[in-house]
């Protein structure tokens, strides 16, 4: 029962996110850049032992 509710809420959030992305075509690019930069920062941090 709780799994069904959780799945339903996740679907609603995903639908809301997709609607926002349609409203702002550049919004998805910003998200990709943020993820990419965070991965690069993590890699450099591990590389230099910080």
From Swiss-Prot:
From which residue to which does the signal peptide run? 1-10
Residues that make up the propeptide removed upon maturation:
11-35
Entry's InterPro entries? Frog_antimicrobial_propeptide
Role: Amphipathic alpha-helical antimicrobial peptide with potent activity against some Gram-positive bacteria (MIC=4->80 uM), potent activity against fungi (MIC=10-20 uM), and no activity against Gram-negative bacteria. Does not display anti-leishmania activity. Does not show hemolytic activity (LC(50)>80 uM).
User: Which superkingdom, per the lineage?
Assistant: Eukaryota
Which keywords does this chain's UniProt record carry? Amidation, Amphibian defense peptide, Antibiotic, Antimicrobial, Cleavage on pair of basic residues, Fungicide, Immunity, Innate immunity, Membrane, Secreted, Signal, Target cell membrane, Target membrane
**Example GO biological process:** innate immune response
The entry's family comment says: Belongs to the frog skin active peptide (FSAP) family. Temporin subfamily.
Which GO cellular component terms, listed alphabetically, does the Swiss-Prot or TrEMBL entry include?
Answer: extracellular region; membrane; other organism cell membrane
Sites of Phenylalanine amide modification: 48
Which organism's genome codes for this protein? Pelophylax saharicus (Sahara frog)
Protein name (database record): Temporin-SHc
Which tissues express it? Expressed by the skin glands.
A Pfam short name: FSAP_sig_propep
> Record keywords: Secreted included?
yes
Q: Does the keyword Signal apply?
A: yes
Its subcellular locations are:
Secreted; Target cell membrane
